[in-house]
Structure formats: C-alpha cells, structure tokens
Amino acid sequence: MNSRPTWIQVEFIRGSRTFVNLCWACILVCGATGFLLVGFSSCIGKDLIPILSSKQIAFIPQGLVMCFYGIAGLFLGLYLCCTVFWNVGSGYNYFDKREGISSIFRWGFPGKNRRIHIRLILGDIEAVGLRSQEGLFPSRILYLKVRGRQSIPLTRIGENSTPEYMEEKAAELARFLRISIEGF
C-alpha cells in the first residue's frame, strides 16, 4: 500500500557517505601515515616501521619529500573523512502540486551555510533539463530550468547512471510537474 499522496513527490539524494569514499579515506590515511613515518625515520636515523628500512633514504631530498607527501595525504584523507562524516551533498528534492511549491535541500560543510535550502514556486519552473556528456568520463545531470535563475542541479555530479535511467527520471518529473524536457 502506497501512503504517499499523488500531489507530492519526494526524492532523497545520497551524499558523500558511501562505502567507496570510506575506503578511499582509509587508504589515503594509511598510505600517508606510511610516507610520513618513513620520511621521519630517515630524519632521526631509526626505523619507526620495522619492515621498512630507512637507512637507504637520505633525509634531504627523499625523506623531506616523503614527509611532505605524508602530510599532504593526511590532510586529503582527513578532508575525505570529514565529508563522509558530515554526509555532504545529501538531501532531498520535494515537489508539492497542491501547495505549488518546490523545496530542494542539501547538507553542506559546517558553518553558516551548512543547510542549503532552495524554495521555488512551481509556476517559475520552465523545464526539466538533462545535460549529457559522453567520452572518457561520461556524466549526466538532471536539472531544473527556473525563470530568472541559474539552472539548479537535482542529481549528484558524480552520479554515474545509465542514459535510460536518467531519461526516465527526467520524463517522470516532467510528467509530474506537467512541463517540458530540455536536453543538451
């Protein structure tokens, strides 16, 4: 039994809290820690990692560069861990035909703009757009074309969906809102 009214459509958007992002964060932190420890080992002359000998690595320039890469990797890993923890990019797209409003909500980074909330009047939405780019890194973005505003993306930028799925999503939303579809 579907208890959702026919005049409301809600789509939840997955953010950056994915298994792949968590794996990359762990790999980055572990690799960067190894680089930092080997670089620091070459500085003090003792092996901090027993299975890796730092006797063949001179501190200047190899050890210094490894320390730099280790610190940079730790910052990138920490950044990725924070985006996973805060679930940046998650949210919802809400369309209500009875009230005549649309609400697009996303979580951002902590601060005064943590909550990104865009409210629109359904009458201002001109079309549903589907921007497709093929090639080595294909991308398909579903967006709303709004009168007097920039286009508002509805899907994640890194979302890798099939053309058929995205076309079906665009057609479903256009049918629900009774507006046209544009493509690029």
UniProtKB/Swiss-Prot annotation:
It comes from Adiantum capillus-veneris (Maidenhair fern). The keyword ATP-binding does not apply. This is Photosystem I assembly protein Ycf4. Seems to be required for the assembly of the photosystem I complex. It is found in: Plastid, Chloroplast thylakoid membrane. The gene is ycf4. Keywords: Chloroplast, Membrane, Photosynthesis, Plastid, Thylakoid, Transmembrane, Transmembrane helix. GO terms for cellular component: chloroplast thylakoid membrane; photosystem I. The lineage of its organism: Eukaryota, Viridiplantae, Streptophyta, Embryophyta, Tracheophyta. Belongs to the Ycf4 family.
